[in-house]
């Protein structure tokens, strides 16, 4: 039996309004619990369109057929008009998710975090995280115990900023296994649970065809030597590709692969490490990567 942490990122208004209810229904039918990370502030995701001038981002949008994958409402959100606030407008959906799944903060403003957090000072970052946590806690009526940085934009500055909130864990980076990042003080920080597996949009049209993805992914899961964690998006697997996701769950069950919330992957003493800026194939720009203590 192979246990895989299932992380669901919710980036947009439509992903929350349409994708999350569909995913909740699918997960309920398959008796699966997951960790769902919500963006709760304005939906300004369309402002990423300026990145089309970057060849790597343009190629990703073309090979993943982004207009079909996400829809034009997502691709244009917050461009010609102010972005709609996601959280309170979809409070009932978020509360329903929290009844059955682990719920955490993805971002206040997903676009702002992904585009600008790398240049923020620590207090700006703390204020942004606090605003998101406060909003999500108002919605679900209970403390938020986990978070996952938007776009995996995380480094030492993010690690230090999140310590102020005493969360149980964060999932801010890509890597191989859960660990504790070393703080500037030299003490271990809040546990990190890295994502170990590629997302749909990182590999489709580059490493694998859409129709072959599920078999390809299950093979990667079976070969994963660390602690497998897989991320889906409400805007993708909850919308245009929900049938592919259902097929993945069926095939996974046949192969002895089970999915669980990320917190179930925390056990025993965790190794020490750091979150450093790095790059991975299929994703434009830098992102947080796990670096084990003593390695460079």
Curated annotation (Swiss-Prot):
Pathway per the UniProt entry: Glycolipid biosynthesis; 4-amino-4-deoxy-alpha-L-arabinose undecaprenyl phosphate biosynthesis; 4-amino-4-deoxy-alpha-L-arabinose undecaprenyl phosphate from UDP-4-deoxy-4-formamido-beta-L-arabinose and undecaprenyl phosphate: step 2/2; Bacterial outer membrane biogenesis; lipopolysaccharide biosynthesis
Annotated Pfam families: Polysacc_deac_1
Gene (name only): arnD
The keyword Lipid biosynthesis belongs to this UniProt entry's keyword annotation: yes
Listed GO biological process terms: 4-amino-4-deoxy-alpha-L-arabinopyranosyl undecaprenyl phosphate biosynthetic process; lipid A biosynthetic process; lipopolysaccharide biosynthetic process; response to antibiotic
Family to which this protein belongs: Belongs to the polysaccharide deacetylase family. ArnD deformylase subfamily.
Keywords: Antibiotic resistance, Hydrolase, Lipid A biosynthesis, Lipid biosynthesis, Lipid metabolism, Lipopolysaccharide biosynthesis
GO cellular component, one term: membrane
Hydrolase keyword on record: yes
Gene3D superfamilies hit by this protein: Glycoside hydrolase/deacetylase (3.20.20.370)
Protein name: Probable 4-deoxy-4-formamido-L-arabinose-phosphoundecaprenol deformylase ArnD
GO molecular function: hydrolase activity, acting on carbon-nitrogen (but not peptide) bonds, in linear amides
Catalytic activity entry: 4-deoxy-4-formamido-alpha-L-arabinopyranosyl di-trans,octa-cis-undecaprenyl phosphate + H2O = 4-amino-4-deoxy-alpha-L-arabinopyranosyl di-trans,octa-cis-undecaprenyl phosphate + formate
Domain NodB homology: 2-260
UniProt-listed Enzyme Commission number(s): 3.5.1.n3
Annotated InterPro entries: ArnD, Glyco_hydro/deAcase_b/a-brl, NODB_dom, Polysacc_deacetylase_ArnD
PANTHER family cross-referenced by the UniProt entry: 4-DEOXY-4-FORMAMIDO-L-ARABINOSE-PHOSPHOUNDECAPRENOL DEFORMYLASE ARND-RELATED, GLYCOSYL TRANSFERASE-RELATED
Entry-linked PROSITE patterns: NODB (PS51677)
């Amino acid at each position: 039996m192979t246990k895989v942490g299932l992380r669901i990122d919710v980036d947009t208004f439509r992903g929350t309004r349409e994708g999350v209810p569909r995913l909740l229904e699918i997960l309920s039918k398959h008796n699966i619990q997951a960790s769902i990370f919500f963006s709760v502030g304005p939906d300004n995701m369309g402002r990423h369109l300026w990145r089309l001038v970057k060849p790597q981002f343009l190629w990703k949008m073309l090979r993943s057929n982004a207009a079909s994958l996400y829809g034009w409402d997502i691709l244009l959100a917050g461009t010609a008009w102010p972005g709609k606030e996601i959280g309170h407008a979809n409070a009932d959906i978020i509360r329903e998710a929290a009844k059955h799944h682990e719920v955490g903060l993805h971002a206040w403003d997903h676009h702002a975090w992904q585009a600008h957090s790398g240049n923020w000072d620590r207090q700006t970052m703390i204020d942004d995280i606090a605003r998101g946590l406060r909003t999500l806690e108002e919605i679900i009526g209970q403390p938020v115990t986990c978070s996952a940085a938007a776009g995996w934009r995380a480094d030492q500055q993010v690690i230090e900023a999140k310590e102020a909130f005493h969360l149980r864990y964060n999932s801010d980076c890509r890597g191989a296994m859960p660990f504790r990042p070393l703080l500037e003080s030299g003490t271990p920080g809040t546990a990190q649970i890295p994502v170990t597996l590629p997302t749909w949009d990182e590999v489709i049209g580059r490493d694998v065809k859409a129709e072959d993805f599920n078999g390809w992914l299950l093979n990667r899961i079976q070969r994963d030597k660390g602690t497998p964690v897989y991320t889906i998006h409400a805007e993708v697997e909850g919308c245009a590709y929900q049938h592919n996701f259902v097929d993945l769950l069926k095939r996974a069950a046949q192969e002895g692969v089970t999915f669980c919330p990320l917190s179930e992957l925390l056990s025993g003493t965790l190794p020490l490490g750091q979150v450093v800026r790095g790059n991975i194939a299929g994703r434009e720009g830098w992102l947080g990567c796990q670096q084990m203590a003593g390695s460079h």
